[in-house]
UniProtKB/Swiss-Prot annotation:
It comes from Mus musculus (Mouse). The gene is Spmip10. It is found in: Cytoplasm, Cytoskeleton, Flagellum axoneme. Microtubule inner protein (MIP) part of the dynein-decorated doublet microtubules (DMTs) in flagellum axoneme, which is required for flagellum beating. May serve to reinforce and thus stabilize the microtubule structure in the sperm flagella. Involved in the regulation of sperm motility. This is Sperm-associated microtubule inner protein 10. GO terms for biological process: flagellated sperm motility. PANTHER family: TESTIS-EXPRESSED PROTEIN 43 (PTHR35247:SF1). Expressed predominantly in the testis. Keywords: Cell projection, Cilium, Cytoplasm, Cytoskeleton, Flagellum. The lineage of its organism: Eukaryota, Metazoa, Chordata, Craniata, Vertebrata. Residues 1-16 have a biased composition (Basic and acidic residues). Disruption phenotype: No defects seen in the sperm morphology and the percentage of motile spermatozoa is comparable. Howevwer, velocity parameters such as average path velocity, straight-line velocity, and curvilinear velocity are slightly decreased in the spermatozoa. Microtubule inner protein component of sperm flagellar doublet microtubules. Pfam families: SPMIP10-like (PF14983).
Length: 141
């Protein structure tokens, strides 16, 4: 005869004092110590590469003519000359390695300039229609 009680394993009850229950119910913004999913960058290689791909450094990074002169001129002008994001090449395939927080990396460079207007006429343009420029302006609004 089947009993009316459930004979399955007893599950632990979640109390109000249980910290794990509180953490699972809170959104990510209210959890100060934990990382959110958009703060983490997991690099991926392509499937055609092996487990440990061969390291490749571009030749112009190793031996660039007048590199020291260019760095001195950039320092004199106050231009940041360091890498924003160092790109690694493994087996001739590029990937970006985020060693720093994404927001901190973007603050190093110049801000993006938003083009507010496109000229209505260009002597080099094949299509000299105002429809193209009006469509471009509509996207910026």
């Amino acid at each position: 005869m089947a009993s009316e009680k459930d004979d399955g394993p007893a599950l632990p009850k979640l109390d109000d004092d249980n910290q794990t229950a509180e953490n699972t119910c809170k959104p990510a913004e209210e959890q100060p110590q934990q990382l959110r999913w958009d703060d983490i960058h997991l690099p991926r290689f392509s499937l055609k590469q092996g487990m440990i791909p061969t390291r490749y450094v571009m030749p112009w990074k190793e031996n660039m003519k007048f590199r020291n002169v260019n760095l001195q001129q950039a320092e004199a002008c106050g231009i940041y000359a360091g890498p924003l994001e160092d790109s690694l090449f493994w087996g001739y395939s590029e990937r970006l390695c985020h060693g720093e927080d994404r927001k901190a990396v973007l603050k190093k460079g110049l801000p993006e300039i938003k083009i507010t207007d496109m000229p209505l006429h260009s002597p080099l343009s094949r299509y000299q229609s105002t429809v193209i420029s009006h469509g471009f302006r509509r996207r910026l609004i």
